[in-house]
Amino acid sequence: MTTPRNSTAAVAFVMLASRAAFAQAPPAYRADDLGTLGGTYLLAAAMNNNGDIVGSGTVADGTLHAFRWTRAGGLEDLGLFGGIESQASGINDRGDILGFYFDAAFVTHPFILPAGGTMQALDGVFQPSALATNDWFTGMSSNGRAFRAIPGGVVEDISAFISFGSAINASGATAGWSWHADPADEQPTAFRYTDGAGFVDLGTFGGPSSYAYGINAAGTVVGAADTSLGVWHAYRAVPGAALQDLGVLRTGGVSRSVANAVNDAGDVVGTAEGGGSLTAFRYTDDRGLIDLAPLVPVAARAHGALYSAVAINAQKAIVAIYSDPNGEFRSELLTPRDDVPAPVVSNVSADPRVLMPPNGRMVPVYVTVDVADEYDDSPACTIVSVTDSAGPRFGSNQDVAITGPLSVNLRAKWHEGDNRIYRLNISCVNALGGATAASTVVRVSNR
């Protein structure tokens, strides 16, 4: 609860009006913490369009286990698959899961776990990273090359040099990064591989290197590219066009950004520096790059600081990573709200609430507002207007003077007949632009 002045009982009439919002207010998000597997760490890696999430987390003894999270079933430990540690790296819209486990000799064993089926080993693969709906998957092959394949099919290397495939769509278009010589030269650059164009180097922003981390159905690739100043900037690359610099959150000094994922609408999420620390961002064409931290509930922020956003789906839900007070990474699902949340005003009161004539003096009146907000610790409440029951015949604009956000001077003068009533109209606005109107009254006694 936020109280601009201390308040006791509800001593004045409170009128709550409908909520309003600034037309350009960014969307707010509901936050669902994914929890843990009994350990301290849970890192999400991928999400499908149904909102199902996979990744890895520690159990009580510190061992890393693959997990699946669904809204219906919550967090599920997928086990070790016969190894000593396991990780899940991809999930498609059918619910098939891509991952790998380590045996006692720390040899990697990639697998696909079909929805409702049993694990299938993936031969010729060193580390799988992403899975498309029609079973295309990518990663690094056993000979250290980016590849694409379908389960049971041929593992097709798509670079002649050391490389990694990080993302793939249902058409088999693949994104990742590759070095340009064998043995590897100093810096890799991002690529897109398609059947029509083959291997396309996406370039940089004038620096030596770039990486690709996401691709959508249209073949739009996102990632990070080095500038000539050696600073990473998030980019979006539409097929046939140059890299689009998505910018940074903070101007002045060194500020970096990295794009991790893109949905089919072209919305991008990732990591950026804001105010000297890392945070999660979302980029859209209409709003540009925005910090997600102020858009989640205050209660969710109390769990820890947002660190990164790693996935966004067709419903614009976002998987975010945060760092808890102990420095451990945890994961949460951010679901966009259809409305703009507004403050909740429980009481408005004026002090004094009765003015005693007859000397007509101007009396200072102070307003107290009891207000709470899910997204803002301190919504701003102000007196926006005062109405006077005396009307223009008896009243005067010299009878009212707003002196501060929640203070006003009112003239203690009444006209014949009923008590004179001043109505103080209040607006409380949160950081998202959500607004609530309320009012309280001050009476000039006729006795």
Predicted regions and their residues:
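Bacterial N-terminal signal peptides that target proteins for export
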Residues: 1-10
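Generic short amphipathic/hydrophobic targeting helices enriched at N-termini
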Residues: 10-11, 361
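Context-gated lysine
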Residues: 15, 134, 313-316, 413, ...
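N-terminal signal peptide c-region/cleavage motif recognized by signal peptidases
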Residues: 18-20
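Residue-level hotspots at or immediately adjacent to binding/recognition sites across diverse folds
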Residues: 24-338
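Proline-threonine-serine-rich low-complexity tracts
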Residues: 338-447
